[in-house]
Swiss-Prot record:
BP-aspect Gene Ontology terms: translation
Superkingdom assignment: Bacteria
Homology family: Belongs to the universal ribosomal protein uS15 family.
Assembly and binders: Part of the 30S ribosomal subunit. Forms a bridge to the 50S subunit in the 70S ribosome, contacting the 23S rRNA.
Official protein name in the record: Small ribosomal subunit protein uS15
Pfam families (alphabetical): Ribosomal_S15
GO cellular component terms, A-Z: cytosolic small ribosomal subunit
Length: 89
């Protein structure tokens, strides 16, 4: 259930600060959001896949922690990221 390299490269280009930026908070949140959206589509078809659902909940928790960190450290970057990804908060 991973993302293709093309999708990852597009996310890195859109949210990265420089060309090789893979670890900034914005990139991590954007990658997690793409994986979460991919898994949500998977669960519409495979309702009883509880093993993957546990992984989804871990990703949501990780994204929540990263967005809380970003909100605590830099509110402007946080609001820009939330608007760009279309997340609630």
């Amino acid at each position: 259930m991973s993302l293709s390299t093309e999708v990852k490269a597009k996310i890195l280009a859109d949210f990265g600060r420089c060309e090789n930026d893979t670890g900034s908070t914005e990139v991590q949140v954007a990658l997690l959001t793409a994986q979460i959206n991919h898994l949500q589509a998977h669960f519409k078809e495979h309702i009883h896949d509880h093993h993957s659902r546990r992984g989804l909940l871990r990703m949501v928790s990780s994204r929540r922690k990263l967005t809380a960190y970003l909100k605590r450290t830099d509110v402007a970057r946080y609001t820009a990221l939330i608007q760009k990804l279309g997340l609630r908060r």
